[in-house]
């Protein structure tokens, strides 16, 4: 990979991420590579701020933070399909990030320049809110948003119990009506996030599909389902005419929806390009390490066993 311009995006409000970003930038500049550094938060679209004055697409984006920082970068960069290399600095679980100690590896940049890495192309979701009550007004009010992990729907009423009633259509076919705390539509990448907490399945990122999971449904028959990635899903609030539903993209509030409106969710045209420093990465090894499955426990026991 020929490195001409690198963005270093770090987690907003994290002292350690900022310090690591400054050090990383100095190391990149010492190689004669142009670098731009900026912070990123849930409501801060750093990418647009950097692109507007420069109009130059980076060769590589370095993200320093947790999975939330990576998700934000992926949403804003997907249309450019720029490789994202992320490190867990000031973050939590870090399913999408590398260990920050790898930043100290003197061979890091030469490995990247010599293409000693793998690229994982991750499916994303695209959603839009539209009005459907007046056939002449369908699609007139539109609010587009993207997600790498998930798009989910929850009640935003403050004066009543936070339950909502949502209707699901798949490819124009009525499928179910969910009454409960909400509904999650997840990608394979997001299958180890909020969707997993609701009892949804874990999908290998090499599979392109959409998981539909109810959040605390008031029915034992409401089970998670997996549908083809090419499906067109529609979620709309039904029942109480005063009900308002908050739409969240990767854990960030993105839009409000009320009766008479619906959200259409489909597979996004572009993918998030995740750079993996292992040339033969193992998704299952990541699962055992991050979720502390038996495989990682056995490895630890073997390491501690007397020789």
From Swiss-Prot:
It catalyses: NAD(+) + ATP = ADP + NADP(+) + H(+). Keywords: ATP-binding, Cytoplasm, Kinase, NAD, NADP, Nucleotide-binding, Transferase. It is found in: Cytoplasm. Its cofactor is a divalent metal cation. GO terms for cellular component: cytoplasm. The keyword Transferase applies. GO terms for molecular function: ATP binding; metal ion binding; NAD binding; NAD+ kinase activity. The active site is at 67 (proton acceptor). Pfam families: NAD_kinase, NAD_kinase_C. Belongs to the NAD kinase family. Involved in the regulation of the intracellular balance of NAD and NADP, and is a key enzyme in the biosynthesis of NADP. Catalyzes specifically the phosphorylation on 2'-hydroxyl of the adenosine moiety of NAD to yield NADP. NCBIfam families: PRK02645.1. HAMAP family: NAD_kinase (MF_00361). This is NAD kinase 1.
């Amino acid at each position: 990979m020929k490195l001409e311009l690198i963005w270093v995006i770090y987690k907003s409000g994290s002292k350690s991420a900022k310090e690591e970003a400054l050090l990383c930038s100095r190391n990149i500049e010492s190689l004669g590579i142009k670098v731009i550094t900026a912070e990123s938060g849930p409501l801060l679209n750093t990418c647009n701020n950097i692109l507007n004055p420069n109009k130059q697409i980076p060769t590589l984006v370095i993200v320093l933070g947790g999975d939330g920082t990576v998700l934000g970068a992926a949403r804003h960069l997907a249309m450019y399909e720029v490789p994202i290399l992320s490190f867990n600095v000031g973050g939590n679980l870090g399913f999408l990030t590398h260990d920050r100690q790898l930043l100290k590896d003197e061979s890091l940049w030469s490995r990247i320049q010599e293409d000693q890495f793998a690229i994982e192309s991750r499916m994303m979701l695209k959603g839009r809110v539209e009005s459907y009550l007046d056939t002449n007004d369908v699609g007139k009010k539109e609010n587009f948003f993207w997600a790498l992990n998930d798009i989910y729907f929850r009640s935003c009423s403050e004066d009543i119990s936070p339950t909502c009633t949502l209707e699901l259509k798949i490819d124009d076919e009525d499928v179910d009506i969910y009454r409960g705390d909400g509904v999650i539509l997840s990608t394979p990448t997001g299958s180890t996030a909020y969707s997993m907490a609701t009892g949804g399945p874990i999908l290998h990122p090499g599979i392109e599909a959409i998981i539909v999971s109810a959040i605390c449904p008031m029915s034992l028959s409401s089970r998670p389902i997996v549908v083809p990635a090419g499906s067109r899903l529609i979620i709309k609030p039904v029942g109480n005419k005063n009900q308002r539903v908050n739409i969240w993209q990767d854990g960030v509030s993105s839009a409000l929806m009320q009766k008479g409106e619906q959200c259409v969710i489909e597979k996004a045209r572009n993918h998030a390009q995740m750079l993996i420093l292992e040339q033969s990465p193992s998704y299952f090894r990541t699962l055992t390490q991050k979720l502390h499955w038996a495989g990682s426990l056995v490895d630890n026991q073997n390491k501690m066993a007397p020789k």
